[in-house]
């Protein structure tokens, strides 16, 4: 007996979605448009009657897992164009005050632990970074770009060869998207 694996997702008001022949899912909402390629053998995606249906051809374990993964990706895309994602970070230092500023698609961290050379973190995609005092806010419509940009910033202030319990300087994620 073959059990059919399918999940349905309601499309919220004010959001239009489409799924093209080349397996690209597109969501458009008040904050913008975001696209993502969703392909896996045996998985079909249909957009009809105000809902998105993710369907598996067989009941194999891998396909069942991918149905859940695709469902989560689609929900994140629709939430991103409707509400957006925001990640809050805080700047901590003990002795040397850091100068943090945004320059185009990079975040420049100066005077980190008294270093002369600034550290540079990449900002991905359409992500916006705002620095105000000791707070850094990373926001955007793509959850993966927001999370990866926040991780890039946190990694650039990682201290090697020092005890992290004592040397706690850095920029740390306080609230995830």
From Swiss-Prot:
Short name of one Pfam family: Ribosomal_L6
Gene Ontology CC, one term? cytosolic large ribosomal subunit
Q: Which GO terms describe its molecular function?
A: rRNA binding; structural constituent of ribosome
User: Keywords assigned by UniProt?
Assistant: Ribonucleoprotein, Ribosomal protein, RNA-binding, rRNA-binding
Under SUPFAM superfamilies, the record lists:
Ribosomal protein L6
Q: Which InterPro entries match?
A: Ribosomal_uL6-like (IPR000702), Ribosomal_uL6-like_a/b-dom_sf (IPR036789), Ribosomal_uL6_a/b-dom (IPR020040), Ribosomal_uL6_arc (IPR019907), Ribosomal_uL6_CS2 (IPR002359)
Q: In the UniProt record, does the keyword RNA-binding occur?
A: yes
Q: Which GO terms describe its biological process?
A: cytoplasmic translation
Q: Write out the function statement from the record.
A: This protein binds to the 23S rRNA, and is important in its secondary structure. It is located near the subunit interface in the base of the L7/L12 stalk, and near the tRNA binding site of the peptidyltransferase center.
PANTHER family assigned to the protein according to its UniProt record, in alphabetical order: 60S RIBOSOMAL PROTEIN L9 (PTHR11655:SF16), 60S/50S RIBOSOMAL PROTEIN L6/L9 (PTHR11655)
Subunit structure, interactors included: Part of the 50S ribosomal subunit.
The identity of this protein, by name, is Large ribosomal subunit protein uL6
